[in-house]
Structure formats: structure tokens, C-alpha cells
A protein has these predicted regions:
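Cys-dependent protein tyrosine phosphatase-like superfamily
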Residues: 1-99, 113-157
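Catalytic nucleophile loop
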Residues: 108-109
Length: 157
């Protein structure tokens, strides 16, 4: 029987860093259909509007009954407001199966660092290692995720 992760194993940097979260790059329509059939519930897309889109993902996800959220991440949006929105979306998806993607997994890895540290209790080194496994390559994006986590760590009970 297919699992949500196995249906997406061919996307760039496919990874399942935590139960309930599958990450990677851009899926195809067929992969989204298989993800839904295997129990997928929601898609969080952090690509910028200017990026090439091989399919109308909103239309496809609506047809499939998948929740679809877009929070664009680009050079001008590496701020706390954007990270707050991403973390809210990831937290709201808990207990459901989420596909969290960008074009390659690079931005997703960075955006998950605060989730790993603040919500999962990981040490910074482990959070960064997990983010690299997800697809993080950019030092600038890593700094965005780490700095956010460090500033907000005191906000946690």
C-alpha cells in the first residue's frame, strides 16, 4: 500500500523529516493525486509568484480536496511575519498529512528550523542537520531560520 511519502519519493529532495510532514520540491499533478489517495490532507507551497509553475496547483488541490496554502518566500520576504505565517500553517496541519514544498526543498529546510527547535525541542545542530536533509543549501536561508528560532526560543513555555 502506498504511503504519502512513497507517492512523492520522486520529487526533488523528497523527505519525511517528521511524522505527518513530507517535504521536497515541486510535485506533479499525478503525484498530488497519489498523495491524496494515500491519505494526504494539505499542501503548503512557499514558492514565490514569479517562479515557473508547471501546473495550476491551486486548481488541482481544490479538485482533489486538499487544503492548499501559499506563503511566498523570496529574498524580500525573509522576515518574522513570513516565518510566523509558515509556523502557523505547519502547526495547524498537526495531526494531518502535510506536503510542504518549494521548488527544491531549500527554503522548506530553512523554514522548518524554527519548527524543529521551538516545537520539536531539537538542539540547533540537530535542527540544521535535519534542515539540510530536507534540502537546505543556502547560508542566507539557514541564518533566517536560525535567527528566528533563537529570538523566539524564550517565547516558549
Amino acid at each position: 500500500m502506498a504511503t504519502p511519502f512513497s507517492t512523492l519519493s520522486a520529487i526533488p529532495n523528497a523527505c519525511q523529516p517528521l511524522p505527518g510532514i513530507v517535504t521536497g520540491g515541486q510535485p506533479t499533478e499525478a503525484q498530488l493525486e497519489a498523495f491524496r489517495a494515500a491519505g494526504g490532507d494539505a499542501v503548503l507551497d512557499i514558492r514565490a509568484p514569479s517562479e515557473p509553475r508547471p501546473l495550476d496547483e491551486r486548481t488541482v488541490t481544490e479538485r482533489l480536496g486538499l487544503d492548499y496554502t501559499v506563503i511566498p518566500v523570496a529574498a524580500g520576504t525573509l522576515d518574522d511575519e513570513t516565518m510566523d505565517q509558515i509556523l502557523d500553517a505547519v502547526r495547524q496541519a498537526q495531526g494531518r498529512m502535510l506536503l510542504f514544498h518549494c521548488a527544491s526543498g531549500n527554503r522548506v529546510g530553512a523554514a522548518l528550523i524554527p519548527h524543529f527547535v521551538l516545537d520539536q525541542g531539537m538542539e540547533e545542530q540537530d535542527a540544521v542537520a535535519q534542515a539540510v536533509r530536507v534540502g537546505l543549501k543556502s547560508p542566507e536561508l539557514m541564518a533566517w531560520g536560525m535567527e528566528y528560532a533563537r529570538r523566539h526560543r524564550g517565547d516558549q513555555p
